[in-house]
Amino acid sequence: MKVALELQPCCGNRSGIGMYTYELARRMRSGDGLEFAGNVFNFLGRNDNENALAGIEMPIRVQKTMPYGGYRRIWHRVPIPYQALFPPADLSVFFNFIVPPRIKGKAIAVVYDMTYLRYPETMNESNLRRIHRDIAYSVARSDRIVTISQFSKREIHELLQVPSEKIEVVYSAPSVTAETADFQMVQQRLGIRRPYLLYVGTIEPRKNLIRLIQAFNRLKKEAGIPHQLVLAGGGGWKTE
């Protein structure tokens, strides 16, 4: 069976979705009847995809004639089959919610949460309209939905009316590769001391950080915990 992995989230400014995609992809090996390959867009070869995908041991097919953003904007109006851009596969896995139109073979979409339905006010309006349309199509087109927690599975089942048996949970986890010296340097530079509670993720409203800070302050006041609260992550939408 030929399995194609959409590795676009690994490229550019790698977010949590990019880390999830990268860590899963680099642990997949061809064999036992499975033949893995990765698909990425790199318009005119402008991006350093080779470095971004280092450690992923599978053939990488690169589409250089069209930018990914351009493809996303036109794919509902211009009938460009995905297989016109990449070789066909028996199974295609899309790690960023969306399955492109006109996919041949079976498809899996990874849907991480239902933020766009539960908390639409935390999202950019133009993105929200596109996500509503694209996720509805993707969920209907996919043969399986993968998500990252039992909570998200229940949400997808409840809000999108997806049968539970169609949804699989594959948990996410960080790759811990830093050396002890790196931790010590960061602790000294930022004034971090043990014990501490650590949040890792994009710093933006939809991560519910205000509630986290409120809960932490309550713990400090009522339970007298000695911990610091450490927030680690890049800036996102409306970080300010």
Language-model segments: residues:
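Carbohydrate transferase catalytic cores enriched for Leloir-type hexosyltransferases
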Residues: 1-240
